[in-house]
Amino acid sequence: MAKRIMTVDDSASVRQMVAFTLKKEGYDVIEAVDGKDALSKLAGTVDMVITDLNMPNLDGIGLIKGIRAQAAYKFIPIVMLTTESQAAKKAEGKTAGATGWIVKPFTPDQLVAVVKKVLR
């Protein structure tokens, strides 16, 4: 059974690129437009979440905290995919429960390498 990954980004083009790349590698992908949408779609088995940081309604940090507050998803990998690369933002993400960080722009190969490493 394919691993299921949720990609969360307010940019449709980023969501589509992430989804296309991961589907090509055999993963099932759920798309969400922001943190609030992601929490509403977080049902059943999700093996990993890839989220932007800066989004309307509920940002990536708020989403991570919301996911980590649910026992069923307390330990799933969550990777931030964002233009933010400052140490303070990374520390804030890590404190909230982020597993890893990919800085935009990124290549599909970088994304796949991180996903495979995290889902081992």
Regions found by a protein language model. Give the residues of each.
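Receiver (REC) domain active-site loop signature in two-component systems and cognate sites
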Residues: M55
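His-Asp phosphorelay/catalytic-motif detector in bacterial-type signaling
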Residues: T45-D47, A72-P77
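Charged docking surfaces used in two-component/phosphorelay signaling
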Residues: Q16-K24
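C-terminal output helix
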Residues: F106-V115
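Active-site residues of response regulator receiver
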Residues: D52, T82
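Acidic, metal-coordinating helix/loop segments flanking the phosphotransfer/catalytic sites
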Residues: E31-M48, G66, A91
